Structure formats: C-alpha cells, structure tokens
Regions:
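Low-complexity, intrinsically disordered Gly/Pro/Thr-rich segments
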Residues: 70-76
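Short S/T/G/P-rich N-terminal loop/turn motif that feeds into the first structured element of a domain
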Residues: 1-49, 56-67, 79-96
C-alpha cells in the first residue's frame, strides 16, 4: 500500500474553502481503482491543512497522479501561500 501526503499553509480565514476542496477531492477519488481512503487534517489556528491518501499499489497512485492530481494541485496551489509539501510513502502494516 502507498500513501500520498500533502501539507499546505493558507491565508487566514480559508477553512471553508479548504473543506470544499476536500469534499470535491474525495468525491473525485472515491470511485478510482486502488483508492483505499483518505484522512484530511488541519490546524485552523496556524492556517495549515493537509491530506493523507491511501492507495492499494504504486501503479494505482501513479495513474491518479497523471490523470487527476494536476487539477487538484492547481486548486491547492491557488489556496496555498507557500509551496505545498508533497510526499509519497510506502506503507508498512504490522503483522498480527
């Protein structure tokens, strides 16, 4: 499994816009092959927000990065006041 993390900082008072983008992103991702889930998080006091998407395989993640992410990055970049932090991680799941 693979995870994609995005963290960005906005100007003050952008929480409702960030939530709208999160809702749109989830709606776009939920039916895509390999999508396992997403967690959105934020710190409104410091205007910092982020997401962590889970994908079944690296190939699934790569396919999404080519097709959907350019538009999502455009939207995120419009909200961000500094370059967003983007990372991809291989996920380790402990064995029982």
């Amino acid at each position: 499994m693979y995870g994609q993390m995005l963290i960005f900082k906005t100007a003050s008072g952008k929480l409702s816009e960030v939530e709208k983008v999160a809702d749109q992103a989830f709606a776009a991702m939920k039916g895509i092959k390999g999508f396992k889930g997403v967690t959105y998080f934020g710190d409104p006091d410091n205007n910092e927000y982020g997401s962590f998407y889970l994908w079944e395989t690296k190939e699934d993640l790569d396919a999404v990065m080519k097709e959907i992410m350019p538009k999502m990055q455009e939207v995120t970049n419009a909200l961000a006041i500094e370059p967003p932090l983007r990372r991809i991680y291989e996920i380790y799941e402990p064995k029982p």
